[in-house]
Every structure is written in structure tokens, then in C-alpha cells.
Amino acid sequence: AHESTLGNLFSDAYKWAVEQATGQTVDVALTAAGVIRETMPVGHVTVSDVFNAASLGVGTEGELIGVYITGADLMNALEVDSSVYPLMHSAQLFMSGVEYSYNTNRMIFNKVDYAMLRRADDSLEAIDKDKLYLVVTGMYAGQMLGSVEETSFGLLTITPRDAQGNPIAVEDLEDYVVYDEAGNPVKEWYAITSYLQQMDGTMEEQYGQVDSRKVIYESWNPAKLLRNANKFTYILLAVMLLLILLSALILRWIVKRIGRRKNAEQIKKEK
């Protein structure tokens, strides 16, 4: 897993385009590795380059959707990126509006040890697990995240919701496509193209390197292994403690049994 300049560009473009089209502030925008089909050339970028790099803009493919998720589910989305990615590379996520880090040595589904919302002015804001956040993504990534509960055997849930917090079925996500003022659906490739046009040639300056919105590292430091631990780490610790106690009890029983046998043999010799 890694932070990607192209992934950052795509997610930033989604956020910008939807805010322009709707006037709403988007909390987080995201895209998945499975959406990025090709790289884009250095220097002059054409609409065709963007169209080929992003999903096809046909039918419901490539349309941006806007849904709400809780802060707890946003954290679960980060765990999808850190824990599911090694098993399914297309699940790697790239986000705008959030910065986070994860330790690859931590417990699965608890690899993320730091996460904050990164606002437009670069200020940081804690993620409220009970609050609803407006999230923008493409249809492909939205459907993938909506089926996380099934693919993770119920261990992780990411429930798309409407503005009132009512759950949205995955098959109903098409009802939450983002439209501009003219009534046209906002496509991923169009969002990226429009974003690049308004940058006025500064893409290389802004996206020539990553900006540490996703930091991946490896450490066996106990403090870092337990930082912001969740239920999965606590369950693992409880199981490990139980195994240690059981091992100690079994060892104690074996020692006592050996001791009794030796005592019995000693008594027999004395007789």
C-alpha cells in the first residue's frame, strides 16, 4: 500500500467538483485503486488522458455519488484501506479531507493508529464517531464499500446513509448520484478535467509529490502497537492472556503430576 499522487488528485477533484456543483461542503472524497485504469502523462494533459485514466463515463459507471456515513464507519473505511488491501489490491483507497497513519504490524482491522479530518484550510479536526459526514465517491467504490460487511463476514460495517441518517441499500445508491445545476450527472472524468482546468497549469507543483495524508510504517514498539487500540486488538490481547493462563495451569498440573509420581516412587523404594 502507498500514498498515490494520482489517487490524491482524483479524490481532491471529486471533492472540488461536487462542492462546485452543489454548493455543499464535502467532508471526505475517496477513490479506489480499482477505479484508476491508467497513469497520466507528465506535462500537458488532455481530456482523453483523463478519460482513459478514470472510469468510463457511460451509464451509471463513473458517476459520483454523495452519501453520509458516521465517523465510526469512516474509521472502518480507513481499516479497509489498511487491512483489506493486502488481500484485495483494488480495495486500496485514496482520500481527500482526511489524514491518517497505520502500522502494518498491528492487528488486522486495527492497523490505523491516527486519523483526523483535514479541512480546506489545512486545519485538523477530530473524527466524531457518532457524527454524520458527507462523503463523495464514484459508484464503483461506493458499491464496494457498501458491501464491506458481507465481504468481511460482519467484522466491519460501512453503512451509506441519507442526510437524516437513514440507511441506504447498496442497490439504491444510484438514487444518490450528484447532479450539477443543469441537471447533468457529475462524472468522475469530468470532475478531474474541470479540476485540472481551474488549476491553470499548477498540477505538477501541487501533485509532483505526496503530501503525507496517508503514512504507512512498520513498528513493533508496544506503545505504537497499542495506540488507539479498538475491540479487535483487545480481543486478541484477551485471547493471548487466556492462552498464557491456560498454559500456566497446564504446566502447573504437569509439574504436580510429576511430583506426585516421584513421591510415590520414593515411598515404594522406602518400603
Regions found by a protein language model. Give the residues of each.
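Catalytic centers of hydrolytic enzymes
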Residues: A1-K271
